[in-house]
């Protein structure tokens, strides 16, 4: 049995004291079977988003909050969009999102339903000590498997496993080797809330996530938490 630890650095909360990150850990999943019901739920979330965002998505409060957060650590939000802004703009074209696999589709569905970033990462031997923090000099990011290391700006918010960067610019882009595949069986999800997204919104998204993964991927939820400035760490035992 191994231990999975997830921490949000105090430096993140210093800049964003009301930030919350929902974290949910699953094991023994079956991510191999596409499901028409899940696809229909995704289409419903896309349609609902189009009725909620009828003007410039950059000005929608839940998206504007991320643009402000990106500016704070030196990113240009018009060049490097948060995952929820990029996803929303794609849906508003209007395009339907592709069916990738159930876990990825569930993350996209929740992002659109709550208008917040939600992502999934596989858990492996080298990814059991996770931290959301600001960059360190030794950090390395590989955007593509087998590719070259990409330089990272100082002060950028990144998701890490040791010096390995799993996601750049908070919610912008995952490393090439962190993709969730059809054979993936153990994962963690991130669900992000910056005001005006509330504690209740993040908790509701976490509850939806647990229900959807149980319905469409089976497996077990090993633990879940909403991390905040008072409770920045989560520990789960993996079997």
Locate each region found by the language model.
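Charge-biased, low-complexity intrinsically disordered regions
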Residues: 1-239
């Amino acid at each position: 049995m191994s231990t999975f630890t997830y921490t949000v650095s105090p430096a993140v909360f210093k800049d964003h004291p009301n930030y919350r990150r929902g974290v949910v850990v699953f094991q023994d999943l079956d991510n191999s079977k596409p499901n028409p019901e899940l696809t229909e739920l995704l289409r419903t979330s896309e349609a609902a988003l189009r009725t909620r965002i009828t003007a410039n998505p950059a000005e929608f409060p839940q998206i504007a909050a991320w643009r402000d957060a990106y500016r704070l650590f030196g990113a240009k939000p018009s060049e490097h969009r948060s995952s929820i802004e990029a996803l929303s703009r794609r849906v508003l074209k209007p395009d339907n999102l592709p069916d990738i696999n159930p876990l990825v589709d569930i993350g996209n569905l929740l992002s659109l339903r709550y208008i917040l970033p939600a992502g999934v990462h596989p858990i492996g031997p080298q990814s059991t000590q996770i931290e959301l923090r600001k960059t360190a000099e030794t950090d390395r990011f590989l955007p593509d498997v087998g590719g070259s290391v990409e330089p990272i700006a100082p002060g950028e918010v990144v998701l890490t496993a040791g010096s390995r960067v799993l996601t750049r610019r908070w919610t912008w882009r995952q490393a090439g080797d962190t993709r969730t595949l059809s054979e993936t069986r153990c994962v963690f999800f991130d669900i992000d809330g910056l005001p005006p997204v509330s504690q209740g919104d993040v908790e509701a998204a976490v509850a939806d996530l647990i229900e959807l993964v149980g319905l469409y991927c089976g497996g077990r939820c090993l633990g879940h938490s909403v991390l905040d400035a008072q409770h920045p760490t989560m520990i789960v035992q993996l079997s």
